[in-house]
UniProtKB/Swiss-Prot annotation:
This is B3 domain-containing protein At5g42700. It comes from Arabidopsis thaliana (Mouse-ear cress). GO terms for cellular component: nucleus. GO terms for molecular function: DNA binding. It is found in: Nucleus. SUPFAM superfamilies: DNA-binding pseudobarrel domain. InterPro entries: B3_DNA-bd (IPR003340), DNA-bd_pseudobarrel_sf (IPR015300), REM16-like (IPR044837). Residues 110-201 bind DNA. The keyword Nucleus applies. Coiled coil: none annotated. SMART domains: B3 (SM01019). Keywords: DNA-binding, Nucleus, Transcription, Transcription regulation.
Length: 211
């Protein structure tokens, strides 16, 4: 009985195998299986992402460079003369008035004591109104300032404002003018002044000695 059962089972198994084989052949599965087995799958390596490089920051040691201004070596000690007493300032005006009286040239002249606005900041020099009306005319123009060395400096005269504008700063800086210095302006030509400087606190010394 046992042998008979095994034989029937074997026949049934073989029959199923044959049926499955025929189905695979009908679907062309054997050939597909061979292709899959024979083909090697190539796996591409992962590409590295390019990360933008951050530029390196370098610390730079910047040294301060002191640039010396032109004419610093020729400056007088102006800081000590910014706030001179009225007594000292009046003494400089008195000496300038005396110098004016001794000119004896017959040319029109006037005395002008320097204020802060004349020698720093805006560098504007107002002239006596009556002197301007009498001797300088009603129109703007160029007025030349001649120092005691004979050097000439052109300035712009503004008739409506009765004063010197452009060019006056150059004269003031070139002669190291400071608060309290007193100037005598002598009109030697219609558009030219000879300028004499009395330094405040100079104790009678000439402007040449104090420059």
């Amino acid at each position: 009985m046992v042998v008979e059962k095994q034989t029937k089972y074997e026949e049934f198994r073989l029959k199923r195998v044959e049926e499955n084989k025929k189905r695979m052949e009908a679907l062309n599965l054997p050939k597909l299986s061979q292709i899959l087995n024979s083909t090697s799958v190539k796996i591409s390596p992962m590409k590295k992402r390019s990360i933008p490089r951050t530029p390196e920051k370098k610390m730079v040691d910047v040294k301060r460079v002191h640039i010396q201004r032109r004419g610093v070596g020729k400056k007088r000690d102006l800081l000590n003369r910014v706030y001179v007493s009225e007594e000292i300032r009046d003494e400089a005006i008195s000496r300038a008035n005396k110098f004016q009286d001794e000119l004896g040239s017959g040319y029109p002249s006037f005395v002008k004591s320097m204020l802060q606005s004349h020698v720093s900041g805006g560098f504007w020099l107002g002239l006596p109104v009556q002197f301007c009306k009498s001797h300088l005319g009603l129109h703007d123009g160029v007025i030349t300032l001649i120092d005691e060395e004979g050097e000439e400096y052109e300035t712009i005269y503004l008739a409506r404002k009765n004063g010197l504008s452009g060019g006056w700063m150059g004269f003031a800086v070139a002669h190291n003018l400071a608060y309290g210095d007193t100037l005598v302006f002598e009109l030697v030509r219609r558009t030219a002044f000879k300028v004499y400087i009395t330094r405040v606190g100079s104790c009678g010394e000439s402007s040449k000695d104090m420059s």
